[in-house]
């Protein structure tokens, strides 16, 4: 992935949403959440582990987020962009809203990354397939990357445990 990202010339966007939930951070402020995401010692959180692995692999990284809402993270040649998708009540509405937003705000996107937890798990959607459908509806020529880590320390897209997360950046 690292070589592919470098070839595309875009940053890796590390997800900060839900950061540190294992330490009961539902009441934390956005600043506290971001502090946890960027603190090398806060490895109890999924995004801190991803962030540390990316840094170790010398991958250019932008940390975005800190909300507790469905959010799509977009990597462009100029850096990372966060699109907040709170509101839609259905997968179809969410997909349409995301596609329209991407067409309007990030037409030059080179990669998309999707948050792990709050993206409508209750609907049972396969998130890897969903983000590709969104990119397709947005007429994006982008290569789609998905990094999704669950609180049970495995990905719903591709079974990767946290201790093996460095392999994502090789």
Residue locations for each model-derived region?
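C-terminal motif of bacterial Sec signal peptides marking the signal peptidase cleavage site
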Residues: 15-18
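Phosphate-interacting basic helix/loop segments used at nucleotide- and nucleic-acid interfaces
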Residues: 46-61
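Low-complexity intrinsically disordered segments
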Residues: 110-170
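N-terminal interaction modules that seed assembly of large macromolecular complexes
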Residues: 63-87
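Bacterial N-terminal signal peptides that target proteins for export
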Residues: 1-8
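Mature extracytoplasmic domains of secretory-pathway proteins
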Residues: 82-122
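Repetitive helical segments and hydrophobic/amphipathic motifs
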Residues: 11-12
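Bacterial Sec signal peptide processing site at the extreme N-terminus
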Residues: 20-31
């Amino acid at each position: 992935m690292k070589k592919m990202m470098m070839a595309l010339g875009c940053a890796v966007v590390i997800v900060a949403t839900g950061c540190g939930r294992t330490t009961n951070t539902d009441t934390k402020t956005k600043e506290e959440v971001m502090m946890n995401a960027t603190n090398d010692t806060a490895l109890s959180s999924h995004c801190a582990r991803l962030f540390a692995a990316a840094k170790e692999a010398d991958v250019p990284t932008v940390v975005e987020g800190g909300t507790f809402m469905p959010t799509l993270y977009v990597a462009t040649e100029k850096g990372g962009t966060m699109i907040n998708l709170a509101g839609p009540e259905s997968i179809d509405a969410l997909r349409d809203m995301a596609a329209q937003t991407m067409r309007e705000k990030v037409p030059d996107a080179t990669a998309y990354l999707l948050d792990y937890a709050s993206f409508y798990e209750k609907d049972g959607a396969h998130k890897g397939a969903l983000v590709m459908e969104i990119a397709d509806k947005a007429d994006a020529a982008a290569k789609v990357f998905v990094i999704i880590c669950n609180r049970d320390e495995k990905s719903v897209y591709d079974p990767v445990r946290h201790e093996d997360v460095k392999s994502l950046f090789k």
